[in-house]
Amino acid sequence: MADQQAGTIVGGVRDIDANANDLQVESLARFAVDEHNKNENLTLEYKRLLGAKTQVVAGTMHHLTVEVADGETNKVYEAKVLEKAWENLKQLESFNHLHDV
């Protein structure tokens, strides 16, 4: 199914406009790191958001590329956060190491 105004496919992953609600996206990135730390008993430190994409599913899936500090080593992870505003739900779906910086 296509969204004719935006020219995108519903359900497709699309880049988030860098100027669109930066604080909300950064908040989701920090949430992802905090949740991963809680789930894995780690102490990764959020450094910065490197990229963000979004996908409309049964809610919104945010695909976030984040840089974190793991002791003296900076690492890049891809996080997926599911958000369902009508259920007041925010859930970390995955948090995968991509590479060291």
Curated annotation (Swiss-Prot):
Query: N-acetylalanine: which positions carry it?
Result: A2
Site entry: Reactive site: G11
User: Which parts of the chain span the membrane according to its record?
Assistant: none
Mind telling me which InterPro entries this protein's record contains? Cystatin, Cystatin_dom, Cystatin_sf, Prot_inh_cystat_CS
GO biological process annotations for this chain's record? cellular response to cold; cellular response to heat; cellular response to water deprivation; defense response; response to wounding
Q: Where is this motif: Secondary area of contact?
A: 55-59
Top-level taxon of origin:
Eukaryota
Upregulation: By wounding, nitric oxide and infection by avirulent pathogen.
Q: What does this protein do?
A: Involved in suppression of hypersensitive cell death activated by either avirulent pathogen or oxidative stress.
Q: What is this protein called?
A: Cysteine proteinase inhibitor 1
Native species of this protein? Arabidopsis thaliana (Mouse-ear cress)
The gene designation is: CYS1
